Every structure is written in C-alpha cells, then in structure tokens.
Regions:
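Conserved catalytic-core segments centered on acid/base and nucleophilic motifs
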Residues: 142, 190-196
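Active-site pocket-lining/capping segments in soluble small-molecule metabolic enzymes
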Residues: 1-139, 144-176, 201-332
Length: 332
C-alpha cells in the first residue's frame, strides 16, 4: 500500500496498529462473502441478480427484513427456485415480532431493542409456524432476533423436525457488543452472527477470537444502524474478520419494513445501489487486499434454497458448517 510507505518515511506506521489477520476461512477456503440486505421479495432479488451481472460481481447471500409471513406461498416457492438456480442463499426474517404486535413497549424510544423479539407463547407458536411454512417452500436460512426462539428452532432441528441444512442467522437487532455475548449466541446454536456495524478493527479482532462462526458485518449501514460508510476498509475488515459476510446497506435510504407493493419500486432502486456499493468496495479490496478470496456462487456452506418437499426421513447429516484454518491456494 503506497500510503503506508509515505507514512513510514515520517516514522509513522498504520499497518503496525492493525490487529492480526484471521487464519479462519469458510468451508470452501474463502475469506469472505457478499450479502445484500433488505431484499424483500422476488422482484427485488431479480434486480439484485441483474445488477450483479452488470457489475460482474458475485452476490452470495441476500436477506430480508419484513418477515417470511408477509410473502405468499407461491412467491416463497418462486423466490426459492430463482435463488437456487443462481446459487444464492436467501435468509428470511422470522415474521412475528414485538415490533409488529399490539404492545406499545417495542415502539417506544427505550423499548426499541425488543422490536425483533417474540411476545408470549402464542407468539413463539406463530414464529415456529412461519419457519415451517417457509421451509416447505424451500427456504433454508432464517434471521432470528430472539434467543428463546433460537433455542426452540435448534431443538426442533435436533429432533429432525426441521432440515439439518437450515441456518440461523442472528439479526443485527440482537447483535452482540462484546465477545462474551457472542459466545452465548454461538452456544445457543447460531450459525452466523451479525455484530454492530460500528465496531473498530480492534473490536472486530476480539470478536473473531471468540468464535469460529462466520461474522456478518455491515460495510455500509442504513441511518437507522448508524450510517457507517466503510467501503474503503473492506480489505482490513475481511483480513481481520474472516470468515466474514460483508453486508452492504445504504446510507440516506428510506426504511422499508414492512415492505409491500407500495414500496417495492423504491426497494428495487435501493437494492441496485447496494450492489453498486459492493462493486466499489471490491475495487478497493483488489487495490489493497488482492490475496483475499471471495466464495463463488453456490459455494459449500451456503444455505441455498432447496425447492423440494422436506421430509423427516431425508433429514440426515451434519447440521453445522465446518470452518477450516488452512490458507486457500485458489486465485480470487
């Protein structure tokens, strides 16, 4: 990096202050994957895939925030089929949550942190049914923001009532702020964990040391999550946080949840802009971290939809993705 050389001539060294690089990788040996959040329906997914082709980049995962419960069964099946063909993981937020309910607490200034949690036993029942409904359509990845719900879903998975290949992605709404909290979520059965978008590289290194699970991190976040814009930092974030899902939100964009037909045109425009931001970040990575490897479409460990009927009899195998420590040898 030419800038580091200029700093060293003045007796300064930015590289010496950077935490050590992670030796952990995704199962395919890659360092990172690209995620586009707030992909709220099939039309938005198709726009993301089209924009990715235009920029000649790979989007490995998309996530959705409005909730699986707000998509019709036919649309869930179409979403699963299109994503499966493209080799893209689709992670749907479990729909029922306090932020949608009758109670005022989660919509208050001090209670907003409860918006993603599930209220009461009936709420848990609805949430589990929402997952089962999406699983029947082929979806295999879910955003969870309630520790009790996570525990129940993992228990059902262990009992063979949910597919072994299902993944449980911890939402930024329940992001751990320290390594101990991250370890708790790891122990409850999370398969990938979103940490706060404003972590320093030192804090990212601490989080990485606490778990071998993939970490999800907003490289750019919407204003509701702090509005950080860190595309130029992608090489450092990946090197320190590997295996890392680099998420691209969009500052100065409107909130979308819950999305519907009245917002889908805006959701498409926002999603296209996010893909463009990811393309810019990858240019920065090529400039400053060319040895860092991104997973290909359909890579091992991605929870790509399986648009085939689920049955307990076929539900066998290891439920977790391995994380390897060997440095990959394949080119980027």
């Amino acid at each position: 990096m030419k800038a580091d050389e200029a700093l060293r001539r003045l007796g300064l060294s930015a590289s010496e202050s950077r935490p050590a690089a992670s030796d952990r990788r995704f199962p395919d040996g890659a360092h990172f994957r690209i995620e586009i959040p707030s992909v709220e329906n099939l039309r938005v997914l198709e726009a993301v895939l089209e924009e990715a082709r235009r920029h000649d980049i790979v989007v490995n995962r998309v996530s959705q925030g409005s909730g699986a419960m707000l998509l019709g069964e036919s649309e869930l099946r179409e979403l699963a089929a299109v994503a499966a063909e493209a080799g893209v993981e689709v992670s749907l937020f479990v729909g029922p949550r306090e932020g949608y309910g009758l109670g005022a607490h989660a919509r208050s200034a001090e209670g907003a942190g409860h918006a993603g949690q599930v209220r009461g036993l009936r709420g848990l029942s609805y949430a589990i049914e929402d997952v089962a409904r999406a699983v029947e359509a082929g979806i295999r990845s879910f955003l969870v923001a309630d520790p009790g719900l996570l525990m129940l879903l993992r228990d059902m998975q262990s009992a063979g009532e949910l597919p072994v290949e299902c993944g449980w992605k911890i939402s930024v709404a329940m992001a751990p702020s320290n390594p101990a909290a991250l370890m708790v979520l790891d122990g409850l059965g999370a398969t990938t964990i979103n940490i706060p978008s404003d972590v320093t590289t030192a804090e990212l290194g601490e989080m990485r040391a606490a778990t071998s699970l993939p970490i999800d991190l907003y490289v750019e976040s919407p204003d509701s999550l702090g509005g950080v814009v860190r595309e130029n930092e992608l090489a450092d974030l990946v090197a320190i946080g590997s295996p890392l899902y680099a998420k691209f939100g969009l500052r100065n964009s409107r909130p979308l949840y819950p999305a519907g037909e009245h917002l889908y045109d805006e959701a498409i425009a926002i999603a296209r802009a996010k893909v463009a931001r990811a393309a810019v970040a990858l240019e920065w990575l090529a400039r400053l971290g060319s040895d860092l490897v991104q997973s290909a479409a359909g890579a091992e460990g991605l929870r790509v939809p399986r648009p085939v009927p689920f049955s307990a009899e076929s539900n066998a195998g290891d439920r977790d993705d391995p994380v390897v420590t060997a440095v990959p040898t394949q080119p980027r």
